[in-house]
Regions:
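N-terminal type II signal-anchor transmembrane helix
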Residues: 11-58, 97, 117
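Active-site SXXK
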Residues: 88-91, 95, 237, 242, ...
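Non-catalytic, structured segments within soluble enzyme domains
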Residues: 31-34, 121-299, 394, 435-436, ...
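Conserved catalytic neighborhood of penicillin-recognizing serine enzymes
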Residues: 118-143, 265-281, 375-430, 446, ...
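Soluble, non-transmembrane domains of envelope/secretory-pathway proteins that act on or interact
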Residues: 12-15, 34, 248, 262, ...
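Short, well-structured active-site flanking segments
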Residues: 99-109, 182-185, 250-252, 344-347, ...
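A penicillin-recognizing enzyme superfamily signal
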Residues: 291-311, 322, 333, 341-350, ...
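Active-site loop and adjoining helix of the penicillin-binding protein/serine DD-peptidase-beta-lactamase fold
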Residues: 155, 211-234, 285-297, 304-307, ...
Length: 708
């Protein structure tokens, strides 16, 4: 009988056994010999440095993740952030003696070598988690002899350089899960739509099993059939090993093995997507950016904006900002009705888009008039046809209301009174006040600003209304928690004096509300741009300021869609999302004129009078009213009286005009004799003061001085 045919296979088996026996000896020597470590190249730890950049909410929860430069989802995960059941199952299945061995488990390695010698081929790898991390860092093959030498040497090097916890963290970050998924957190978010600390037993077992064969076991490809059956079999082996290691009970295992494995992949979280993109672009360094965003409120706001935009019609988008105006922190940022909705151009961030604000700037025009002593909320003003050279404003409904109060004019958003007041206040002064208060936009120096003839963004408008809500003090909007210098004195700037801001708030609290809202709880103003291209609403209570824009990003018309009917109901719905109770408004400053009747006002404030600017020195005419002292823009040093904590009064003197006179400092009447042309200002401290004098005919003069 010819035995040559059977001798050859036996020889090949014996040769393999000798190779594996030699390998076992070499591996042991390499693991224990420092001299052996010098034979290998340094371990490329930099390979683990590149991770997905994250944007987090104020509590550290994920808003959005971005792939690494090589297109991978690779997210850091601390052991404390992962399900304890998953960690226990991982160690029970992959490396029972992880916390004890020096990087190489001699028992597991010896068993693997003996099995390979006995069967003539590798049966189990014998790799520890440390060796697997070394392989992932090196990118070397799994089962080659050279790779095993390298893994042993690298494992010893890792154990010398890192703690066990750091090595475990590397595995949690680098374990392959198929496609471009790396690490347990990326896999948990993609396959189960949840953070890894919330994994069930069945889910944890899947995440232990998949890295052994990531491409064949990936959940977005393992549909019904042999691949799916093999996936369940691998998962169940992990579960059975966990039972044997007393990680879970038999009852828990039975329930877990009866569960199906999910198919497909979830989208990664993408809350506040426009803001996240902006921050990532603006901040090139840092793995995680922590924002001021309230994750739950952000999610609710996005749903509200999406639902309402869909109800308004095709191609209509919507944007909103919710701000805690006490700190300037932005709690929700909704840039569009849906970032991925191409039909609504959802990728465009409409919080930053420059649009016409409609009537939304009127409160600030009236606020300056209150400061200058030109008007009071109960001042009567005429709503009748008027012309300013070639400009003849008309009201939104093309009608006129005759004599109304300033309160009514602002609450009804009448156009003619607003333009009249701006003509007296001066568009130049309005633009300068915006600039001096730190606003980042510019408005034209003409009367059309009152009716929307300017360009600003939703962020700009929100910053203005934040200042109103704060009693006239402007602060920057804040998006990052790292910038903890909240609303400091160095950041604050005056937009309106407190009394003027309170008058505006008191008026806006009485503005007509949508049918679904309760009056008085929110001070707000709406706006509609020319041609029905933009609908706005901005409002505030004692804690939150919310601004809403509704429109088409391409600036096409939306006939019939106006601020009160489109944007205001959405704004009130967002207020409801912040909590059931509205925070109360601040109390009125002590120096406001609280009268609700026009007849009770000082005579110069009862009727709004447009200035009659007459040249001085014309025979037969009274000299025009003007402030003779102090001169405009003068600086006056405050002088203290010895033994007294107060400051000496500052003399004021007027010339011309018709008695009686009314004096105001920063819009607040002074206690002065109306039939004298001289009076005194008692300074409250250093700073700029606006001095106004008004005569019996309603003519006025103003000057600004600095006390130091």
């Amino acid at each position: 009988m010819d035995r040559s045919g059977s001798a050859a296979p036996r020889d090949r088996v014996m040769k393999r056994r000798r190779v594996y026996a030699a390998l076992a000896a070499a591996l042991a020597l390499c693991a224990l010999s420092a001299h052996g470590l010098k034979l290998f190249e340094p371990l490329p730890l930099d390979a683990a440095a590149s991770t997905s950049r994250l944007v987090l909410d104020r509590d550290g929860h994920l808003l959005r993740a971005f792939t690494t430069p090589d297109g991978r989802w690779r997210l850091d995960a601390e052991p404390d952030e992962v399900s304890p059941t998953y960690l226990a199952m991982l160690l029970a299945f992959e490396d029972r003696r992880f916390w004890k061995h020096p990087g190489v488990d001699p028992l597991a390695l010896g068993r693997a070598v003996l099995q390979a010698i006995r069967h003539g081929r590798p049966i189990s790898g014998g790799s520890t988690l440390t060796m697997q991390v070394a392989r992932l860092l090196r990118g070397s093959p799994t089962h080659s002899i050279t790779a095993k030498f390298q893994q042993v040497a690298d494992a010893a090097r890792l154990e010398a350089a890192l703690s066990k916890r750091e090595i475990l963290k590397l595995y949690l970050k680098l374990a392959p899960y198929g496609g471009n998924l790396e690490g347990v957190r990326a896999a948990s978010l993609a396959y189960f739509g949840k953070e890894p600390h919330r994994l069930s037993i069945a889910e944890a077992a899947l995440l232990v099993a998949i890295p052994q064969s990531p491409e064949t076991r990936r959940l977005d490809r393992s549909e019904d059939g042999p691949a799916y059956a093999a996936l369940l079999e691998a998962r169940n082996r992990v579960i059975k090993r966990a039972v044997a290691a007393h990680v879970i009970t038999e009852a828990d295992a039975k329930i877990a093995m009866a569960q199906a494995a999910p198919h497909g992949r979830h989208e990664f979280p993408a809350l506040a997507p426009h803001l996240c993109e902006r921050l990532i672009a603006a901040i090139p360094d840092g793995q995680a950016i922590k924002t001021t965003i309230d994750g739950k409120l952000q999610q609710a706001a996005e749903q509200i904006m999406r639902r309402n935009a869909q109800s308004f019609g095709d191609k209509i988008s919507a944007a909103a900002l919710i701000v805690n105006h006490r700190t300037g922190e932005v709690l929700a940022h909704v840039g569009s009705a849906g970032y991925f909705d191409d039909t609504r151009l959802g990728a465009i961030d409409m919080t930053a888009a420059i649009r016409s604000p409609g009537s939304a700037l009127k409160p600030f025009i009236y606020g300056l008039a209150f400061e200058d002593g030109l008007a009071h909320p109960e001042t009567s003003i005429e709503d009748r046809p008027v012309r300013f050279d070639t400009y003849a404003p008309v009201n939104f409904d093309n009608s006129f209301h005759g004599t109304v109060t300033v309160r009514t004019a602002l609450q009804l958003s009448l156009n003619v009174p607003a333009v009249k007041v701006l003509n007296e206040v001066s568009p130049v002064k309005l633009a300068a006040r915006f600039r001096d208060a730190g606003m980042t936009f510019e408005v034209p120096r003409n009367l059309t600003v009152a009716l929307g003839g300017a360009g600003l963004s939703l962020e700009n408008l929100t910053a203005l209304y934040v200042a109103l809500a704060r009693g006239g003090t402007a602060i920057p909007l804040r998006y990052r928690k790292e910038s903890e210098t909240a609303a400091g004195a160095s950041e604050a700037a005056t937009l309106l004096q407190p009394a003027a801001a309170w008058y505006v708030t008191d008026i806006l609290r009485g503005a007509p509300v949508p049918a679904s809202a309760s009056p008085g709880a929110v001070a707000f103003k709406t706006g509609t741009s020319y041609g029905f291209r933009d609908a706005w609403a901005a409002g505030y209570d004692g804690e939150h300021t919310i601004a809403v824009w509704v429109g088409r990003p391409d600036a096409s018309s939306m006939p019939g869609l106006v601020g009160l009917r489109a944007a205001a109901p959405v704004m009130f719905e967002l207020f409801a999302a912040t909590g059931a109770r509205r925070a109360p408004f601040a109390a009125a400053p002590a120096n406001v004129i609280g009268s609700r009747k026009t007849a009770d006002l000082p005579p110069p404030l009862r009727i709004f009078r447009e200035q009659k600017r007459e040249p001085a020195g014309v025979p037969g005419q009274e000299a025009p009213l003007h402030i003779a002292f102090p001169p405009a823009n003068s600086e006056i040093e405050l002088v203290s009286v010895e033994g007294d904590t107060g400051k000496l009064p500052v003399a004021l003197k007027a010339e011309g005009g018709t008695l009686p006179l009314t004096w105001l400092a920063d819009g607040v009447p002074l206690a002065a004799s109306p039939h004298r042309r001289e009076t005194f200002l008692t300074p409250s401290g250093p700073g700029f003061v606006q001095i106004t004098v008004i005569d019996a005919e309603g003519r006025s003069d103003r000057t600004q001085i600095r006390l130091r």
